[in-house]
Amino acid sequence: MLSEMLGEIAALPMVSLLGAALIVVSVLGRRLLVSNIAWAITGQTPAKSLAKRSRLPGLPFKFPNGQGTEKFFGGRSAARRWRIQYGPIYAIWAGLKREVVLSTPEHVQAFYKDSHLHVKATDNNSGWLFAELLGSCVGVVSQGRWKRVRRPFEHPFSRPESLTRPKAFIHEARDYFAVLNPNIQELTINTSNDLKHCPFFMVASIFFGIHTTAQRDELKQLGPPREELFRHAFMGGMNRYAITKYLPGSALALLRQFQGKWEGFVKAAYNRSIQTGDGTIVPLFEAVNRGEMSMQELLQTLDESLFANLDVTAHAVSWNVIRIAHHQDIQQKVRIEIQANNNSEKSYENYVCRDDTLLAACVLETSRLHPVLPFSNPEAAEEDKIVGGYIIPQTDVIVDTHAINIDNPHWVDSNSFDPHRHLGQKDSSRRYNMWRFGFGPRQCLGKNVADIILRIILCEMLNTYELGLLEEEGITGVKLQPDSWIGLPNGVVQMTPLKLDE
């Protein structure tokens, strides 16, 4: 451990070592001085106005995280506050990294039209812990490396392959609800806590096939420490700066423990899949053996698809169930639509794959009103960009998702839940007016299966239950979990078995 620590400290860039100097001046409370020191240490060039050559407005640096923690744990309220104070384009600090925030579709289009050439922040501007967890996964690597790592994963998540998966997904969903409510009786659930593993196991089936009970139990046991690691990463502090990773209280020991257990699980699942011929883990392992990607890239991309997305998919499922439970008129129309397309298993499977249904529109509208993150993940262009009258000098850029999805004149009566607005609408009209899977050519690998999974979960619930939101204040009464980095809703929904004639 000591030799590892000394070796890493020797290799640290000067920015990490000098960052400690900010502690002293931070204690003195001189915010302008701290911000100027941060600019000097990082050597970053600030964005400037074309006309006045003035700096882009933005928030001052605050040690140790800048606004990097607040943008996750309090991002929804912070985004509105910052936009009101600084305008539609401004800058924040994520640790010692400057991030330019865009808030209008025009600015987003100007920046993201060549996103496949952009460079992602390998640590998500969150520090060493995030980098060690996911710094080599397909969602974070860039350019040539991104193309290389993505290639082995493209087939399992392609549109044609995704259309073959509903049968397996339906089986997973039915198994899940059979365990959740075996006697099909009236049940009250917390939408986030009780449903979070349903989409998780559906995605896991893509990689590992039909799970054994032991595999399901092991995956569940790996979840809590992995969630804790993500909370540590986004909380920052000593888990942000590499020089502090060996100090008492860092998450290094928990990280090493998780990584060892995760690698052991994946290798055991690979050996089982060789025997069963089930799952895509075998061809992915073969890609590692051929040198097409490293073992670290494989393990971290699997982690990204499962554990990093555990709360992401839980957020999406939870809000979809909350919305359909609250809007009883829409719920009844969707149920009628489901029943009309449930004459056979094949008809049902085809239905959940269609994009022109009221069910599909409900999923889209929920995603619009409840984006999973307050801000998109940071990425930088290879060349200077002119956006909104400012020169952005190869600096990381993020998007205020609430500003795009809701506070956007493109959406009429934008705060209302109106799934019908999406029926007959072309994807091109949403391209820069709705943040969901990313902007431009480079988008989320799992976007082809995500909607199918959400639709199936809603269908399986609505086929069996009447859903009702147990909040006197309706949607506005749903509170967010305070320790959740993604803002999981604490929605309470009552599942009442349908009568036979319904």
Swiss-Prot record:
The chain crosses the membrane at residues 9-29. The keyword Acyltransferase does not apply. GO terms for molecular function: heme binding; iron ion binding; monooxygenase activity; oxidoreductase activity, acting on paired donors, with incorporation or reduction of molecular oxygen. Heme binds at C444. One of its GO terms (cellular component) is membrane. It comes from the Eukaryota. InterPro entries: CYP11_CYP27_families, Cyt_P450, Cyt_P450_CS, Cyt_P450_E_grp-I, Cyt_P450_sf. Keywords: Glycoprotein, Heme, Iron, Membrane, Metal-binding, Monooxygenase, Oxidoreductase, Transmembrane, Transmembrane helix. SUPFAM superfamilies: Cytochrome P450. Glycans are attached at N124, N190, N271, N342. Signal peptide: none annotated. It is a single-pass membrane protein. Induction: Expression is regulated by the cluster-specific regulator verZ. Its cofactor is heme. It is an enzyme of class 1 (oxidoreductase). Pfam families: p450. It is found in: Membrane. Gene3D superfamilies: Cytochrome P450. Pathway: Mycotoxin biosynthesis. Its EC number is 1.-.-.-. Cytochrome P450 monooxygenase; part of the gene cluster that mediates the biosynthesis of 11'-deoxyverticillin A, one of the dimeric epipolythiodioxopiperazines (ETPs) from the verticillin family that act as mycotoxins. 11'-deoxyverticillin A is required for normal conidiation. The nonribosomal peptide synthetase verP is speculated to be responsible for condensation of amino acids to form the carbon skeleton of verticillin, whereas the cluster-specific tailoring enzymes are involved in further modifications leading to the production of 11'-deoxyverticillin A. Belongs to the cytochrome P450 family. This is Cytochrome P450 monooxygenase verC. It comes from Clonostachys rogersoniana. The gene is verC.
